[in-house]
C-alpha cells in the first residue's frame, strides 16, 4: 500500500471475544488512508488467528506476533515501535474497544486546524455511560497548559482510555518508550506531559466505545479504587508544573487528604493485602509509600463521622453486606 497518513495500532492478548468487532470498526472508517498494525502479545486463545484472517483480506493490516510475553504497557510501547515512517498521526484502539465510523476523520480535522495540536480526544462511551463531558461546548482547541490546569483544578477528565485519544506521530520518538513503563496509569501521565508543550483538541462527538465489563481487566483491580490513586499521583507529579506555587501546595494537600480518606474507608471494609500492595506499588512511582500515621488520622475522622451520622452509617453497612451477598 502507499505511504499511509495514519497508523492505527491494536496490541492484544487473549481478546478473541472482542477482537473481530474492534478490527471491523477500524475497517469501517470513513477516512481510508491508514495502516492497521495488530500486535499479538503471545495470545493462547485464537486471537492471533482471528487477526491473520482479517489481514489476509485487507492489505492495510499487518500482524506482528511476539515470542515473549510483555506487560501491558511494554506491549503498547512495542506496538508503537512498528509505525511506518510516513505516518503523521497515531490512533491506538484497544482490542476490546471499538471506534465509530467518523472517528479518525473528525480527529484529523482538528489536527489540521493547527500544527500546535499534539493530541485530540472526544466524548466516549464507557459501557452505557457518556464520558468526557465538561469540556467547554463552544471550544474545540485549548492551549495545553490551560487544559492541564483545568484537569488539576476540577478533575475534568477528557483524555479517556488510549482508545479515546489520537496523537501526532512526531511525539513518538523512535527507539524510546512512549509510555513510562514504571507507571500504573501511564496514559493519563503521558497526556499531562504532552500538554506542557502541545495544545489539545476536542471533538464534541462520541467517537469511541470502551467496555465496562472487560473480562481482560481483573475485577479485583477495579475494586482497588484505581481512579483515586491515578488522581493523587497526577496531582503530586504535575501540580507544581502547571499551577502557581501556593495553589499547587494547597491542591496537593487537599488531594492527599481526599485520597487517604478513601483509603481509610476501604480499611473498614477489611480490604485484602493485594489492595495495599497495589497502592504502595503506585505510590512508589512518585517516591512515596502509604503513610500509616496519616492514614490513622483519617480513620479516626471517619469513625467520628460515622458516630455522628448513625443513620447513614447503618445504610452504608447494609449496602456493603448486600453487595457481598450478591
Named regions from a protein language model:
Residues 3-6, 27-38, 46, 58-62:
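Short loop->beta transition adjacent to catalytic acidic/histidine clusters or analogous donor-positioning motifs
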Residues 266-326:
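Membrane-interface aromatic/basic loop that binds lipid-linked glycans or pyrophosphate carriers
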Amino acid at each position: 500500500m502507499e505511504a499511509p497518513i495514519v497508523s492505527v495500532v491494536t496490541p492484544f492478548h487473549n481478546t478473541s471475544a472482542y477482537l473481530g468487532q474492534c478490527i471491523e470498526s477500524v475497517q469501517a472508517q470513513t477516512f481510508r488512508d491508514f495502516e492497521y498494525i495488530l500486535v499479538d502479545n503471545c495470545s493462547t486463545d485464537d486471537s492471533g488467528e482471528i487477526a491473520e484472517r482479517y489481514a489476509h483480506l485487507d492489505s492495510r493490516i499487518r500482524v506482528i506476533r511476539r515470542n515473549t510475553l510483555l506487560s501491558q504497557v511494554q506491549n503498547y510501547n512495542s506496538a508503537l515501535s512498528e509505525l511506518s515512517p510516513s505516518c503523521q498521526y497515531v490512533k491506538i484502539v484497544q482490542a476490546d474497544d471499538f471506534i465509530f465510523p467518523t472517528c479518525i476523520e473528525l480527529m484529523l480535522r482538528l489536527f489540521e486546524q493547527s500544527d500546535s495540536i499534539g493530541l485530540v480526544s472526544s466524548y466516549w462511551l464507557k459501557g452505557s455511560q457518556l464520558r468526557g463531558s465538561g469540556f467547554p461546548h463552544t471550544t474545540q482547541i485549548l492551549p495545553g497548559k490551560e487544559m492541564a490546569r483545568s484537569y488539576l483544578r476540577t478533575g475534568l477528565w477528557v483524555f479517556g482510555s488510549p482508545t479515546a485519544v489520537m496523537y501526532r506521530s512526531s511525539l513518538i520518538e523512535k527507539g524510546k518508550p512512549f509510555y513510562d513503563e514504571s507507571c500504573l496509569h501511564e496514559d493519563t501521565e503521558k497526556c499531562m506531559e504532552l500538554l506542557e508543550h502541545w495544545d489539545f483538541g476536542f471533538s464534541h462527538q462520541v467517537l469511541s466505545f470502551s467496555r465496562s465489563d472487560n473480562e481482560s481487566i481483573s475485577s479485583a483491580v477495579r475494586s482497588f479504587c484505581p481512579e483515586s490513586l491515578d488522581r493523587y499521583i497526577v496531582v503530586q507529579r504535575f501540580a507544581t508544573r502547571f499551577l502557581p506555587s501556593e495553589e499547587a501546595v494547597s491542591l496537593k494537600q487537599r488531594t492527599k487528604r481526599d485520597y487517604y480518606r478513601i483509603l481509610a474507608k476501604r480499611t473498614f471494609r477489611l480490604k485484602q493485602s493485594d489492595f495495599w500492595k497495589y497502592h504502595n506499588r503506585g505510590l512508589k512511582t512518585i517516591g512515596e509509600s502509604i503513610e500509616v500515621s496519616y492514614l490513622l488520622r483519617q480513620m479516626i475522622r471517619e469513625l467520628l463521622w460515622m458516630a455522628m451520622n448513625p443513620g447513614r452509617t447503618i445504610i452504608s453497612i447494609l449496602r456493603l453486606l448486600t453487595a457481598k451477598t450478591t
